[in-house]
């Protein structure tokens, strides 16, 4: 059982931070490649030790080779992997993930995403195994708590499903087969052009959504007739924001609230996973946000996972940086037990007993069809499915997931309705008090009793109906 790989990366100070007359210091003092001393805005000092610390002079290649390369290699061999960039807005997350751009970018500035794509296809082409590889690409963003397909904008509210054999799935998401890195990067560019961005006082091109790049790598072995499937997910999180620093208002402020809420949900999941001894009875609130639901497999342990905590080195942002580092330290305690997803190929899975059973069912249905109407046949097939005589494990798992989603949404809707009613009751009570005070001033005691009786009867009738 291994822990999550957690690294910190300090970007160079911005021109604004360099010009600031009140504070011109940096908040991190290096000790070695894994440890540094952090000084907060109150000048209190904390020592942090992580798997690796990338200081201001670090290169994109160094981050890739330590953080992403091992996970990418395992994904090609059937072990799921997840790489996440986390930090406040303007801390360098998108630069670390993409670089200045994922196409036509010099080698020095290439981000994790283009390096992973190139490395993945290089490993596939140099593989000594006699196998056929299939790579599929999907790309989604979580914007205002809706999952949008960035490769097909008509799919603006992708549903998240759970399958007992395949884990978390995005129902109906576009999956594009890609044969080489050039083709993959072209599709990624198309998706990135559709991502929601906006301008704030801290970032001229601030991501207004969480973005996930999903690669499914299937390896069909010719020799032993086995199929390995690895999922590789790269997640560029939107940054946590403080409205007084970003100057956000209107739509941008609402986006920031939603972003902060989902990041808070992520923190709650990590707290639940790392607080105290684990047991089957522990509730992990994966369903509190779309982000945590999509990351459920990674956070739950069936994936290698790496977290890059992107930080500002300036004392101007010391409180936000401290929060980011503490988040990383908590995530470091998540336990992971990733396992290779390997099954026999469809032909190898066929067994005489199952074939015989299917043939018998088929012959019975054919005989019955000879003497029954189409309507009767349809009804009988429905009964067979309902009674479990003929059924699909995948469809049954999907039904369970849909049921759970409906229950969760119903509870949320009811809670919202109760909250709204409570607000109305408070408003009516306030109005009642005002009327009572006015009546007392006007010496009209009868009106006080009438309004009190009206409020009481309305309140009672609602909760008894």
From Swiss-Prot:
Specifically expressed in ovules and anthers. Residues 338-358 are annotated as: Disordered. GO terms for molecular function: ATP binding; microtubule binding; microtubule motor activity; protein homodimerization activity. ATP binds at residues 87-94. GO terms for cellular component: microtubule. Keywords: ATP-binding, Coiled coil, Microtubule, Motor protein, Nucleotide-binding. Homodimer. Interacts with WIP1 and WIP2. PANTHER family: CENTROMERE PROTEIN E, KINESIN-LIKE PROTEIN. This is Kinesin-like protein KIN-1. It comes from Arabidopsis thaliana (Mouse-ear cress). The lineage of its organism: Eukaryota, Viridiplantae, Streptophyta, Embryophyta, Tracheophyta. The gene is KIN1.
């Amino acid at each position: 059982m291994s822990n999550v790989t957690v690294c910190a990366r300090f970007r160079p100070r911005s021109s604004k931070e360099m010009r600031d007359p009140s504070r011109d210091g940096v908040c991190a003092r290096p000790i070695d490649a894994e440890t540094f001393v952090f000084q907060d805005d109150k000048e209190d000092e904390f020592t942090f030790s992580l798997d690796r610390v990338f200081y201001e002079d670090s290169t994109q290649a160094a981050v890739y080779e330590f953080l992403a390369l091992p996970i990418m290699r395992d994904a090609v061999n059937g072990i799921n992997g997840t790489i996440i960039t986390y930090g406040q807005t303007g801390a360098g997350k998108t630069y670390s993930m993409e670089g200045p751009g994922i196409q036509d970018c010099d080698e020095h500035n290439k981000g994790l995403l283009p390096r992973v794509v190139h490395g993945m296809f290089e490993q596939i082409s140099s593989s000594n195994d006699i196998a056929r590889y299939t790579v599929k690409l999907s790309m989604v963003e979580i914007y205002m708590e809706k999952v949008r397909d960035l490769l097909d904008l008509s799919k603006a509210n992708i549903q998240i499903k759970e399958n007992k054999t395949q884990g978390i799935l995005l129902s109906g998401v576009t999956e594009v087969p890609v044969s080489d890195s050039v083709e993959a990067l072209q599709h990624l560019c198309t998706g990135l052009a559709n991502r929601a961005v906006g301008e704030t006082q801290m970032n001229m091109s601030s991501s207004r959504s969480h973005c996930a790049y999903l690669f499914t790598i299937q390896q069909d072995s010719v020799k032993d007739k086995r199929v390995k499937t690895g999922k590789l997910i790269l997640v560029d999180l939107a940054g946590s924001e403080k409205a007084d620093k970003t100057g956000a208002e209107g739509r941008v402020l609402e986006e920031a609230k939603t972003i902060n809420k989902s990041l808070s949900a992520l923190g709650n999941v990590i707290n639940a996973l790392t607080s105290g001894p684990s047991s089957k009875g522990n509730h992990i609130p994966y369903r509190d946000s779309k982000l945590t639901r999509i990351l459920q497999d990674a956070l739950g342990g069936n994936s290698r996972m790496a977290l890059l905590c992107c930080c500002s080195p300036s004392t101007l942002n010391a409180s936000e940086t401290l929060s980011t580092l503490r988040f990383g330290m908590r995530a470091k305690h998540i336990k992971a037990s990733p396992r290779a997803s390997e099954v026999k190929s469809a032909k190898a899975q066929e067994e005489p007993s199952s074939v015989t059973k299917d043939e018998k069912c088929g012959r019975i249905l054919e005989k019955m069809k000879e003497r029954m109407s189409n309507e009767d046949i349809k009804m009988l097939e429905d009964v067979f499915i309902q009674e479990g005589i003929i059924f699909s494990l995948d469809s049954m798992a999907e039904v369970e997931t849909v049921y759970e989603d409906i229950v969760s949404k119903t509870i949320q809707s009811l809670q919202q309705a109760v909250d709204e009613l409570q607000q109305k009751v408070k408003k009516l009570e306030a109005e009642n008090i005002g009327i009572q005070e006015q009546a007392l001033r006007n010496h009209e005691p009868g009106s006080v009793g009438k309004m009190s009786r009206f409020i009481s009867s309305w309140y009672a009738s609602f909760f008894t109906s």
